[in-house]
Amino acid sequence: LPATDQRSRNAALADELGLAVREAGQIALKYFRGPIKSWTKGHDSPVSEADIAVDEFLRARLSREGFGWLSEESQDDRTRLASERLFIVDPIDGTRSYLAGREDWSIVAAVVDKGRPVVAAVYAPVDDELYLAASGEGATRNGGRIATTAGSALAGARIAGPKQMLERLTTIDPETIHEPKIHSLALRMTRVAEGRIDAAFASINAYDWDLAAADLLVHEAGGAMTNLTGEALVYNLHDPVHGAILAAGRDRHAAMLDLVRKRRKQFA
């Protein structure tokens, strides 16, 4: 497709994803803080009947001819690898928080094209905050434009992430301000996109569904989100799992990456 057609198609898809994750949020809220069946899967990872209900809703609403599908709660059949474009979904990102009745969980959907996100939606149902982005169109929260914070200073920067990584950062600059951990990883990185925090780390073993939507939101908000060697993340690979990650406004990201690179072993 010509670039302008592609952009308008992505913008239309962003609106569609926005409606879908909002509706999915209403499904999740019906179960929230009420009696709910939950169990564990894999490495002690919680899953609930709400995760499954939201997953089924999003799959029915979004999946279509010509697009692959990858979701935390769907069986990965790997036919997605033959698709240039696919939906990547996390029905409830932050299930532990959701089951504990906390507010830091979200519903996440992205469209990835040739390994990079081109459309993103992150919805925080408790606060009714909808974050949307389409490639080249900027990023919004509830319709208003958002941007990462400017500047490159580490001193006074509000940073979220795993405790261990933040403690290592303190040894470099004790003036950094550690934000409370945001359990939904997509929401943690999206807080960087909207400038509510200045930077965020993710430890190793985050998955495509945790990262793809937030990646686009951060970039469209004027920031950068990469692995700790500064490379862009590639999605829809055979194994959809990533190493440690840093997100921040562009200048701060470059400065922090420089510091982290010099101490790579401490942060990996």
Regions found by a protein language model. Name each.
Residues 1-92, 265-268:
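N-terminal subdomain of lithium-sensitive/metallo-dependent phosphomonoesterases centered on the IMPase/IPPase/PAP
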Residues 65, 83-84, 115-118, 154-156, ...:
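Short coil/turn connectors at secondary-structure junctions
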Residues 28, 51, 62, 95, ...:
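Residue-level signal for inorganic ion chemistry
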Residues 141-148:
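A structural micro-motif at secondary-structure boundaries
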